[in-house]
């Protein structure tokens, strides 16, 4: 016997969260809970404003229609990426095919005063990998901050993300201030320039490895080995079903590329599932999941070690 529930939720964000020049005051999304006999599976559907093509209202409409079809015996996945991902997670939990083991290691997102960051990063246990957003300020400033961190902590490796912010000139201004001796400790720089060709040229000219992120979701993208390209950053909420995520990871690994499972600012429930997906598909790579502290609460499932308050399922709005 099948049953299901859909929950709508909204989490207040910290004041400083800006995405694509838009301040994100709340994170809005949906959960689907599927039950069959004694088994239960959950999934999160939370399109990311400015990045997802669909709104959460559109996702809600598609999700509710899919749930009704599922209750009637139809299991075909929807095409909308955020819904396909959430539904496929719920089905995988229901079928017990999403492993419980999770990779809760994170590459901490660095912002704020560089002196404070140096102290924090120097105390990190184990492999020191951190992430820095670049492209929000002047490229010269970004280069100086990155150089300072790499100089101060000799065993630190940085993942950088420019979100296609730079022209070729700005990319060169950034690189000018990063000591060539430190550049090999930049694990990768996600999408430095506005076009893929400019990003490729940046990698060739600077020796700084790049990663594809937004490019993966463009219709003309193909997985090929290229000089200077070291990684792909896969955001399942923006990608689609678990099967599509797995196909992308396998395509990357076949070319010797690092595949990084990364957050689209999901709630704690979604983040814990991403940690399980990372342990399953990319066990040797630290995922990019350090976004929970951008929110003011956890929901339904806790992230280990987080002190944020937890909103239980009974407090969420039911849609069925």
From Swiss-Prot:
Pathway connected to this protein: Quinol/quinone metabolism; 1,4-dihydroxy-2-naphthoate biosynthesis; 1,4-dihydroxy-2-naphthoate from chorismate: step 4/7; Quinol/quinone metabolism; menaquinone biosynthesis
Family membership: Belongs to the mandelate racemase/muconate lactonizing enzyme family. MenC type 1 subfamily.
Active site residues per record: 133, 235
Catalytic activity: (1R,6R)-6-hydroxy-2-succinyl-cyclohexa-2,4-diene-1-carboxylate = 2-succinylbenzoate + H2O
Gene behind the chain: menC
Residues that, per the record, bind Mg(2+): 161, 190, 213
NCBIfam families per UniProt: menC_gam_Gplu (TIGR01927), PRK05105.1 (NF003473)
Enzyme class: lyase
Pfam families assigned to the protein according to its UniProt record, in alphabetical order: MenC_N (PF21508), MR_MLE_C (PF13378)
Record's protein name: o-succinylbenzoate synthase
Primary role: Converts 2-succinyl-6-hydroxy-2,4-cyclohexadiene-1-carboxylate (SHCHC) to 2-succinylbenzoate (OSB).
